A protein has these predicted regions:
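Short, surface-exposed loop/turn motifs with a glycine/proline- and acidic-biased composition
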Residues: 536-575
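Acidic Gly/Asp/Thr-rich repetitive segments characteristic of extracellular carbohydrate-active
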Residues: 27-66, 80-84, 457, 476-479, ...
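Extracellular beta-strand-rich solenoid/capping regions of secreted or surface-exposed proteins
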Residues: 45, 49-53, 66-95, 105-143, ...
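Short glycine/acidic-rich loop motifs that flank beta-strands on beta-rich extracellular proteins
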Residues: 68-69, 108-111, 116-118, 130-131, ...
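Surface beta-loop-beta hairpin patches that serve as ligand-binding interfaces in beta-rich domains
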Residues: 424, 432-487, 491
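Right-handed parallel beta-helix
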Residues: 60, 93, 97-103, 138-149, ...
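Terminal processing/anchoring signals of secreted or surface-associated proteins
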Residues: 488, 494, 517, 533, ...
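Predominantly extracellular beta-rich ligand-binding scaffolds that present long acidic/polar faces
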Residues: 67, 76-79, 260, 294-447
Length: 581
């Protein structure tokens, strides 16, 4: 690991640290090159062949036209990019990172797609599925790029497909306008999973010619078919205008956690202007599980304007935990909790609809259903027909929710009910400031007033202490606690997908002196707004206040992070490397 690769960031030169090799990929590169800054590779497929644990691949900005595929033998599918090289642990990953300040876009418009329909014949020509990016590895960190325009013939094709993998960290990735799910994880019984989706977006995905139905399978995020391993988490993610569901964990037999995430307008297509005939349109579809192991956790999430239900359990055999969520103006129900029972073969339904009781019951606490108060809560029952009166039974619908209090909230309980997502159609919402607009520089969710509680709101201090931070004498109802900043979606640590760095990595004591002269970082005069700070792997560490940038930046970094090492400080379009001793 002692190799040195010269690279530039902003206006300064530095050397890679001794803990891993550094490679570059660029749209104008060549796979015959060395993969250096000046002679980058052209494809991630080439990078995948040379990397090992601890290595970093910087992906330069621009459009990558994916027009060739490789065959993934294990799943009998084709891929534009196939990542199979693995890291060794959460602290020794392989990193595929967007070059700071640049935006790589993987465009699959010209990607040849598989023509198989219901079955694969085991050949590339007869494969059923194609994805621009297929991950079949362990301990990777992917960050900062877009995947778009995946085509299809008979089967929906995911923007990013993760198969039999472990601890994949996906950060600030936008997967959109694909003919299938934005993201799809399929981990089976391999002891895998444990992925972290941090600040990712999935929107405007639609599968019009799916053999199962028009719009049937294009979810924003899908996690399916896992039976053991580690828990996958979503933090700070958004799903909107996907033809099927926003988040779908159908047949996921292992827990999933979703927090501080949004689902809007799912079940609509073409920027919200129409509905496909076969899309479901749920915001958070957290089921089904057939073996009683898939108890999921959904907290501090918001679902609005979805065609069907905001928060939906989808005929599961085990309840989930729904804490401090807000459901607003969803078409069918705010919270729909239908449940059932399967035989031991986990295939045959013994009963269509049953209440889940005792340790199998759903846990619903501190949730807001607005404006549809009780009539559309849809707790744990459904009437199959006029003859099925035994199924027409109410079951417990949680505690300390708006419907438990018979709390009929109004517009006066909220700071604002206005957002572009409530009024704008036919346009790309990701470009318009609002709940679904541009993210903060660190990738976290935009801080807007939509659905926040107003001073004096009847939902303030009405909740139960469930272990989440709160400001008043008791927790509030809904996703946003009055008197506290919006929940950060910048993860400081995650047991399921490894630790985000809390300080810059130290240079190895065995590394040689750099052969390039590094200029002393200059103070930034007249600066407005904070600067973002990253480690040498491109991982976000925090911010430096504007006033500290006018003086000794190294001293400010030492005071802020208190660890010697090399930092990247980015303000606007300028990135400086700063060494703290």
């Amino acid at each position: 690991m002692g190799k040195k690769f010269m690279f530039a960031l902003g206006v300064v030169l530095a050397t890679a640290q001794a803990f891993g090799a550094v490679y570059y990929v660029a749209p104008d590169g060549n796979d015959s090159n060395a993969g250096s800054e000046k002679k980058p590779f052209a494809t991630l497929n080439k990078a995948n062949k040379v990397v090992s644990a601890g290595d970093t691949v910087w992906i330069r900005g621009g459009i990558y036209d994916l027009h060739d595929t490789v065959f993934y033998e294990r799943y009998k599918m084709t891929a534009g990019i196939l990542l199979t090289a693995s890291g060794e642990s959460d602290d020794n990953r392989i990193y595929y990172l967007a070059y700071p300040g640049e935006r790589p876009i993987f465009d699959a418009t010209n990607l040849p797609v598989a023509a198989g329909e219901e079955h694969s014949d085991g050949t590339p020509e007869g494969a059923m599925y194609t994805s621009p990016i297929v991950v079949a590895a362990k301990y990777l960190h992917l960050k900062g790029f877009e995947v778009r325009n995946t085509p299809m013939i008979h089967n929906s094709n995911s923007g990013i497909f993760i198969y039999a993998s472990k601890h994949i960290f996906l950060e600030q990735i936008d997967s959109h306008h694909n003919a299938g799910p934005g993201f799809f994880a399929h981990d089976g019984a391999s002891g895998g999973g444990g992925h972290l989706f941090l600040n990712c977006d999935a929107h405007d995905n639609y599968d019009p010619t799916d053999w199962q139905g028009d719009g049937e399978n294009a979810d924003g995020f899908g996690v399916h078919y896992q039976y053991d391993g580690d828990t996958t988490k979503f933090i700070g993610c958004r799903a909107w205008w996907n033809s099927d569901d926003g988040y779908d964990v159908l047949a996921q037999e292992f827990p999933v956690v979703v927090e501080n995430s949004y689902a809007m307008g799912n079940g609509y297509i073409h920027y919200g202007t129409s509905k496909p005939p076969n899309g479901n349109g749920n915001g958070f579809k957290m089921g089904y599980s057939r073996n009683d192991k898939g108890r999921h956790i959904i907290k501090n999430c918001v679902a609005w304007n979805n065609v069907a239900t905001g928060f939906y359990s989808n005929y599961t055999t085990i309840g989930s935990t729904w804490i401090n969520n807000t459901s607003y103006k969803n078409g069918d129900r705010s919270f729909g909790m239908p449940s059932t029972i399967y035989a031991e073969d986990e295939r045959t339904r013994i009963a269509e609809v049953v209440p889940l009781m005792d340790d199998k019951a759903h846990v619903l606490k501190n949730n807001i259903a607005f404006p549809n108060k009780l009539s559309q809560i849809g707790t744990c029952w459904e009437k199959i027909s006029s003859q099925d009166i035994d199924h027409y039974v109410d079951c417990p619908a949680g505690e300390n929710n708006t419907w438990n209090f018979d709390l009929d909230l109004t517009e006066d309980d909220f700071v604002s009910l206005d957002d572009p997502s409530m009024t704008v159609t036919g346009e790309d919402l990701s470009t318009i400031p609002g709940m679904l607009g541009p993210r903060n520089a660190d990738g976290s969710l935009p801080d807007v007033d939509f659905l926040k509680l107003k001073k004096g709101s009847r939902a303030i201090d009405k909740g139960e202490d469930v272990g989440l931070p709160f400001a008043g004498k008791a927790p509030d109802l809904g996703a946003f606690e009055y008197g506290m900043p919006a929940s950060s979606s910048v993860a400081k640590s995650c047991s399921s997908a490894g630790k985000s760095s809390s300080s810059a990595r130290k240079s190895s004591s065995s590394s040689k002196k750099p052969s390039a002269i590094v200029k002393k970082p200059a103070a930034i005069a007249g600066v407005q707004g904070p600067a973002d700070v990253f480690d040498m792997q491109g991982r976000y560490l925090g911010t430096l206040p504007a006033e500290t940038l006018r003086g000794d930046i190294a001293e400010a970094l030492h005071a802020q992070f208190q660890v010697a090492g090399i930092y990247l400080v980015r303000h606007g379009k300028t990135t400086q490397q700063v060494t703290v001793k």
